[in-house]
């Protein structure tokens, strides 16, 4: 029996193969579940005691020789293929590679982030589940303030003080609490409002809000920053600011960009005016600065905010906001080129 095993060792050491199939057949012959090695191991119990030590040694030698031979043959085959450039038919078409696409909301968010990063703004983030102080009170919206009715809010049933944030201004409050001026930050993120879902509104959407706090910041600084943004994102260099109201800024304004009236689509989306509303803005209210332990006599600043979905709808001429959330591949695959 021992001589028979030694004969197999010699066969293993002299074996050669030229293909993967031959190597695999060799591996199965010796190392497979029904291979020669397992047959010898099964015979171990029938070997006389005085021969068991030597029998075990030669079996292990056969196993090691087979494993070494398989590995060596595989390595030689790979090396030979690389040297000869043998990878099959090189004219054969490659297997198709499925390439994904970024979501249009992510594309626009990244574009906005890059534009403001180029002028020194960093990115700040905060929790989507927020408390009353950071979402309302610190932003000059005390309890029972009538402006709270502007935002229909989702409250947490077990704790009325906890809610789903209605804007990313709450992130700005947290940032001002933790950082001293000068401050230049934008806060992109998801927000929630209890609104009816339609082609123009949704209960979940995304915002980018910006904040700039420093000494001697003026309304003109804000206008110039917004003008830079519209030129970079839309390629439009004409804007107008209309008086508006936001509890956390004073004075406040709505920003319109002149879209033009060159096409039928321009007439439709601007309702014949040539102007499109894109964001709100204003000088940070002194009460907000005080609530965040910033002295309004020393510092001033401006804030702005926009809906990412609205910007994406303008850029890509999308008429229904619900399309962003339906995960329809026919829609999403159209943005592969925007990676």
From Swiss-Prot:
Subunit structure: Tetramer of two alpha and two beta subunits.
Statement: the UniProt record of this protein carries the keyword Cytoplasm: yes
CDD domains (alphabetical): PheRS_alpha_core (cd00496)
Gene Ontology terms for molecular function: ATP binding; magnesium ion binding; phenylalanine-tRNA ligase activity; tRNA binding
PROSITE patterns xref list: AA_TRNA_LIGASE_II
Broad EC category: ligase
Cofactor list: Mg(2+)
Family: Belongs to the class-II aminoacyl-tRNA synthetase family. Phe-tRNA synthetase alpha subunit type 1 subfamily.
Places the protein is found: Cytoplasm
UniProt xrefs under InterPro entries: aa-tRNA-synth_II, aa-tRNA-synth_II/BPL/LPL, Phe-tRNA-synth_IIc_asu, Phe-tRNA_ligase_II_N, Phe_tRNA_ligase_alpha1_bac, Phenylalanyl-tRNA_Synthase, tRNA-bd_arm
Xref: HAMAP family: Phe_tRNA_synth_alpha1 (MF_00281)
Cytoplasm found in the keyword field: yes
Recorded catalytic activity of this chain's protein: tRNA(Phe) + L-phenylalanine + ATP = L-phenylalanyl-tRNA(Phe) + AMP + diphosphate + H(+)
Pfam families: Phe_tRNA-synt_N (PF02912), tRNA-synt_2d (PF01409)
Keywords on record: Aminoacyl-tRNA synthetase, ATP-binding, Cytoplasm, Ligase, Magnesium, Metal-binding, Nucleotide-binding, Protein biosynthesis
Free-text comment on the cofactor: Binds 2 magnesium ions per tetramer.
Protein name per UniProt: Phenylalanine--tRNA ligase alpha subunit
GO CC terms in record: cytoplasm
Main localisation: cytoplasm
Binding site for Mg(2+): 250
GO biological-process terms attached to the record: phenylalanyl-tRNA aminoacylation
Enzyme Commission code(s) on record: 6.1.1.20
